[in-house]
Amino acid sequence: ERRGTREDMFTCLKIAAQQFYKREGDKCYLLAGYPWFKASAREEFMALPSCTIGIGRPEYWDLIVNNTAVEEIRNFMEGKPCKLVGMDEPDVLLWFIRALQEYAAYTSIEEVTRLYGQLIIDIMLYIRRQQHPRLFLHNNGLLWVDGRNQPATWMNAVENGRPITPRTGYVVEINALWYNARLFTATIQR
């Protein structure tokens, strides 16, 4: 398929975004960095709307989400091995819900509810039932993370196997994603 000419900023971004698609058989991932990084759950779910529907490539949303991401999330929640790196990071499932919210803006709430409603509910129950190994829901309704021995956020640089910036507690961006996920879940359950 021809990429097109680099006439304007959008076309340049579209061409660049498509370089991050990585196909493996019937699976498709977004690379976290080209060409040196592999597919990483956090970066994939953060970039997913922009690198698919945002550039007019909804077929890649289908390939990445329906053929790969849903299976990876289910495997993680069932304690099975995952190919996607970082599925256990505290904010990953919340970033996936945020990506679905962006997809709802592109399609409709009804479409997202039909396709992914049960998965969203399962993710929220997984977190609320304290099944996530690195997220802890406290009585105040906030999520708490322990980043002393293993990075808990996007600030994930390590030295000698220890986080350079250990972030422990009620991390603001994780709780912002949590609040958003709760509101979105309430919307799809109406």
Residue ranges and their predicted role:
Residues 1-190:
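Acidic, mature catalytic/reactive cores of soluble proteins
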